[in-house]
Amino acid sequence: MAKAYVPRLKKQYDDEIIKAMTEKFGYKNAFEVPKLTKIVLNMGVGEATQDKKKVDQAAAEMELIAGQKPVVTRAKKSIAQFKLREGMPIGVKVTLRRERMFEFLDRFLTIALPRVRDFRGLNPKSFDGRGNYATGIKEQLIFPEISYDQVSTIRGMDVVVATTAKTDEEARELLRLFGFPFPADTTQKKAA
């Protein structure tokens, strides 16, 4: 009987990360160890107020990146200065969970981030105080699924990683063990 496929980062979490987190924070039970719950990708499409096709293009790109169909986000209220009416499509978002979440995270950390120009690591201060991490990407071209020739507009996106961690310190350690490229602690550099 063939074994079920397990994403690389899920296996790494089960085999190594739980053990390392338990040693560092002194958890009494493996279920206390923080874990990833979801990753939300959000792409705002401001040009959609003039051209409705821009949302469709963004949705197609997001589907290639995430591997699942995105939801179109709509304006909650009208804003005359932006020529925006309530209910107009203004972006797309995808929520990834379980295997797809781990697959995306693996591609994001090992393939996409190294392709960012002048990349010096992710901002270690982008935690929300509840153990969740948010970062932005300036262009969708860092993902290999997106062909440079087929892109009409370079768009950025938000990547939010939700965890069950109670504190930012626990979440930072969890993400560091997953391979998030946070720069070395700046306080240690100044002291040396």
From Swiss-Prot:
One of its GO terms (cellular component) is ribonucleoprotein complex. PROSITE patterns: RIBOSOMAL_L5. One of its GO terms (molecular function) is tRNA binding. The keyword rRNA-binding applies. Disulfide bonds: none annotated. GO terms for biological process: translation. Keywords: Ribonucleoprotein, Ribosomal protein, RNA-binding, rRNA-binding, tRNA-binding. This is one of the proteins that bind and probably mediate the attachment of the 5S RNA into the large ribosomal subunit, where it forms part of the central protuberance. In the 70S ribosome it contacts protein S13 of the 30S subunit (bridge B1b), connecting the 2 subunits; this bridge is implicated in subunit movement. Contacts the P site tRNA; the 5S rRNA and some of its associated proteins might help stabilize positioning of ribosome-bound tRNAs. Part of the 50S ribosomal subunit; part of the 5S rRNA/L5/L18/L25 subcomplex. Contacts the 5S rRNA and the P site tRNA. Forms a bridge to the 30S subunit in the 70S ribosome. PANTHER family: 60S RIBOSOMAL PROTEIN L11-RELATED. Belongs to the universal ribosomal protein uL5 family. This is Large ribosomal subunit protein uL5. The gene is rplE.
